[in-house]
Every structure is written in structure tokens, then in C-alpha cells.
């Protein structure tokens, strides 16, 4: 991670199309700092070019990259670099300069046969800025089942099928009473034998198009998005680290008011210092669950130890484990 050691080796940067001589085919790796600086340079150039267009051409709901998408990505990159000032500036640009609006989970349309679950990963969603990634790509590993047998009367055995991957108890238990995200963002596991949903088991599916049984629907449908909710969280975190706690709390209040039942929503007030920063970390986990951001957040949060259990086996990812670094 950038905030762990920006002088560590990252990926090699090849910035032109010239062929290399044979004695230079093994390219040297650039530092993490150099890679991030190049990313920022590229985003700055993209922003500059978009700003030469008229306002109506800077964003169009047509699945293409746009100025607000660039601005949200810049906010995210600056957040990873702990450039709190610019992270907040670009989060605010996304929030204030465009007409995107947070989806109120209290007012979602009633389920239909065509859309039994609300599809947050659609241009119909007022939060969506840019869509990417297919359902088939995202679920290639986690859309698997495991089977087990139970012995019944007279020595008969019955085979059952369960989802191989489910949401952790720790995540599910982090949602407070009245927090609508648990039910709206994550599908419950479906009992294929009894044709009912398990009440205490949640899958890793959600936010994109799902079938009536909570299964991924339409392999080519979009699975991920850049959306407004992240901008509020980026703003809150950047402001909290920049000693602007009132702005951080205001951003959290605006976001969470759309996520809780009105009579159970308690405004986040009085939080300061580390308590506020921890609160924001927890909200990122809940709001952005299964969107591909958690891994990057854990890396910049100090790469904490994680323990997973599978049956009787225990798997431990130690703090600062080399496995926290993606192989190049």
C-alpha cells in the first residue's frame, strides 16, 4: 500500500509504444510512489480533456467514462495516498457539481417478477455514475455450492446443497436494527430443497440483478459501479483526518439518513478523533460490501490479522502478511 511503503517496488511502467532492445526486455519495476504519480497524471489529463467539452458532454448516461467518474476515481486515489485535502475536494465535486442523488432505501419500488430485487447496478439508479464488470466475472468463484449428507431414519441419507461462500457473521452482525442495507444489499441464502430462504444465512450476492431466489441473474449484466455513496464516505474520511469533523459528521448524516428506517435512525453526533475514524471505517465496510473495495481498505488500514474457519480448519492471514500484496 502507498501509505505502508511508497518506495517499495510496484509494477513496471511502459509509457510509450517503442519496442525495447533484447537486452532491455526484462523491464525494471517502478516504485509504488512512481506508479501512483503516473495514475494521478493520467487522471489529471483525462479531467483536463473533459473540461474542454460542454457541460452536457462531460456526463451522459451512456455507459462511457465521464468527468464525474474521473473525479470520483481521483478522490479514491487521493484517499489511498492520504492526500486528505484533495480527496475531499474531489468527493465534493461529485456530490455538488452533478445531479446524482442518494437512493433512499425506504422508498425502493415494490418487487416485481422481472425485478424481485432492486438493481442498484443500473443507470436507472440515481446514485450510479459509471458501470463496469459483468456478473459472470464477479461470481465466477463465489457462485458455487457444496454438498453434505445427513443420516436419517433406517440408515437413509439425505444430500443437501448449500452456498460455498456466505457473508461473515461479523459483517451481518455489524448492521444495527433499522439499517436497511442488510436486507436490501445482501440476498439471503435460498434453501433449494425446501424452497424457502434461510433466515440466518446471507450470501455474497447483492446490489446487481438477482433472480427471485437471490441468485445472480444474467451473466452479462453489470455487477459493479462507481456511485455516489462512495463520494460521501470519501468526504467523511478525508474530512475526519483533516480535522474537519463537522464536515465528516454532516456527510455521514446525509448518507445514513437514506439507509435507515426513519424511526430508528440515530444521527452520528459527538464522534471525534479515533472514534470517528473507526466509525467511518465500519460504515465503508457496510455500505461498500462486496463491491471490491474491502481488500484495498484493509491494506491501507494496516493489513490486520484475519482468521477464517472452514469446518475444523483454521486459516490465518497474519498482520502484514506477504499475501496482502497481490502477486505481480
Functional labels for PLM-detected ranges:
Residues 151-168:
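Short, cationic low-complexity segments
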Amino acid at each position: 500500500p502507498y501509505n505502508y511503503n511508497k518506495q517499495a517496488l510496484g509494477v513496471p511502467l511502459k509509457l510509450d509504444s517503442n519496442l525495447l532492445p533484447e537486452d532491455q526486455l526484462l523491464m525494471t519495476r517502478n516504485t509504488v510512489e512512481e506508479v501512483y504519480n503516473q495514475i494521478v497524471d493520467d487522471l489529471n489529463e483525462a479531467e483536463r480533456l473533459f473540461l474542454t467539452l460542454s457541460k452536457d458532454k462531460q456526463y451522459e448516461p451512456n455507459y462511457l467514462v465521464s468527468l464525474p467518474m474521473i473525479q470520483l476515481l481521483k478522490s479514491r486515489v487521493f484517499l489511498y495516498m492520504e492526500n486528505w485535502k484533495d480527496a475531499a475536494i474531489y468527493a465534493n465535486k461529485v456530490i455538488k457539481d452533478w445531479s446524482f442523488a442518494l437512493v433512499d432505501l425506504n422508498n425502493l419500488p415494490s418487487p416485481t417478477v422481472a425485478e424481485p430485487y432492486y438493481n442498484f447496478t443500473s443507470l436507472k439508479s440515481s446514485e450510479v455514475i459509471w458501470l463496469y464488470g459483468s456478473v459472470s466475472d464477479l461470481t465466477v468463484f463465489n457462485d458455487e455450492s457444496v454438498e453434505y449428507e445427513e443420516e436419517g431414519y433406517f440408515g437413509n441419507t439425505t444430500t443437501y446443497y448449500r452456498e460455498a461462500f456466505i457473508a461473515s457473521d461479523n459483517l451481518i452482525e455489524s448492521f444495527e436494527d433499522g439499517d436497511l442495507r442488510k436486507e436490501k444489499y445482501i440476498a439471503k441464502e435460498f434453501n433449494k430443497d425446501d424452497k424457502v430462504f434461510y433466515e440466518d444465512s446471507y450470501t455474497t450476492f447483492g446490489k446487481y440483478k438477482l433472480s427471485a431466489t437471490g441468485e445472480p441473474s444474467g451473466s452479462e449484466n453489470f455487477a459493479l459501479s462507481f456511485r455516489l455513496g462512495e463520494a460521501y464516505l470519501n468526504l467523511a474520511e478525508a474530512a475526519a483526518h483533516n480535522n474537519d469533523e463537522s464536515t465528516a459528521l454532516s456527510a455521514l448524516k446525509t448518507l445514513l439518513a437514506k439507509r435507515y428506517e426513519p424511526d430508528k435512525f440515530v444521527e452520528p453526533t459527538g464522534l471525534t478523533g479515533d472514534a470517528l475514524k473507526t466509525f467511518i471505517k465500519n460504515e465503508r465496510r457496510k455500505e461498500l460490501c462486496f463491491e471490491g473495495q474491502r481488500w484495498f481498505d484493509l491494506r491501507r488500514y494496516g493489513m490486520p490479522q484475519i482468521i477464517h474457519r472452514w469446518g475444523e480448519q483454521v486459516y490465518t492471514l497474519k498482520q502484514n502478511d506477504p499475501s496482502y500484496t497481490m502477486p505481480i
